[in-house]
């Protein structure tokens, strides 16, 4: 599976990317919305993992842009923001799942498998 990870925290981005590579996935990792947008216009992904709090904006804007283009690529939000309003905004924006940091990497793998069904 080709996966785009959009995460500005180096420790989390490295852990998530390494875990997915170990599971046999191909991973591109971006730390901001600008780079993620460039990647999405040049390559097709099977899954996008996006943080809400990024240095150049909110991950919801990336999610909305993906959906506005009619792209059905599954998107999982992964964020430390655990307010009901954050979850609701993600779901209404078209996210397929929502993980609250810190999360177990095996839980991420399980949710990825569920989305692929």
Please provide the spans of the model-predicted regions.
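N-terminal/domain-start alpha-helical segments
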Residues: 1-117
């Amino acid at each position: 599976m080709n996966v785009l990870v959009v995460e500005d925290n180096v420790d989390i981005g490295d852990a998530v990317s390494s875990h997915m590579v170990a599971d046999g996935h191909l991973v591109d990792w971006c730390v901001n919305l600008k780079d993620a947008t460039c990647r999405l216009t040049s390559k097709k992904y099977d899954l996008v993992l996006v943080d809400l709090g990024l240095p150049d904006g909110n991950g919801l804007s990336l999610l909305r842009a993906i959906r506005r283009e009619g792209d059905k690529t599954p998107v999982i939000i992964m964020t430390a923001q655990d307010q009901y309003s954050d979850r609701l905004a993600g779901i209404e924006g078209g996210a397929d799942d929502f993980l609250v940091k810190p999360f177990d990497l095996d839980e991420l793998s399980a949710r990825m498998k569920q989305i692929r069904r």
